[in-house]
């Protein structure tokens, strides 16, 4: 389904929206000098009440860095990004994904997250008269901090913590935004 109008009249009285992403790193040369370099393929897309998330196909390279015990990891990605029916000055996305387990030597304390930057010509800040602003880049990062409280009573899947979404020109909102969130997490 493609949306032609992005202006929504009336109150939004219900939660709405879906987003789907699948990404895979392909590496068939793990016993070589370039073992940390992988090919990545990815798809993302979705729908919300206030703005579309057009189908996007990404392909590129992923470079994997880790500590000797794999408790700390970092993936750096440079991806070609094709967004259906969208213009882009540079059809590319740069991504970093990290995880730090047992942070500061505290068993069960985890700091992880991602940061994405890409070029996409898109509408933001819709006004009552139907006009809006246009932006050409998007940045979003969601660093998370979790503590495994379940380890203290035999339930290793349970963590408490949260994240802070920091974004610039993300979704239908122009400019910089900070959105903190507390959470309870169950690891499957």
Predicted regions and their residues:
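Transmembrane beta-barrel domains of Gram-negative outer membranes and organellar outer membranes
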Residues: 1-48, 58, 142-144
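Membrane-embedded beta-strands that build the outer-membrane beta-barrel scaffold
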Residues: 3, 22-24, 61, 98, ...
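Short loop/turn motifs that connect adjacent beta-strands in outer-membrane beta-barrel proteins
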Residues: 3, 26-38, 65-74, 101-111, ...
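Transmembrane beta-strands of outer-membrane beta-barrel pores
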Residues: 5-9, 41-49, 65, 78-84, ...
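Transmembrane beta-barrel outer-membrane domains
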Residues: 13-19, 34, 50-56, 87-91, ...
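Detector for outer-membrane/organellar transmembrane beta-barrel domains
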Residues: 54-143, 147
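Long, ordered, amphipathic alpha-helical scaffolds
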Residues: 146-170, 186-187
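Outer-membrane beta-barrel "beta-signal"
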Residues: 176-188
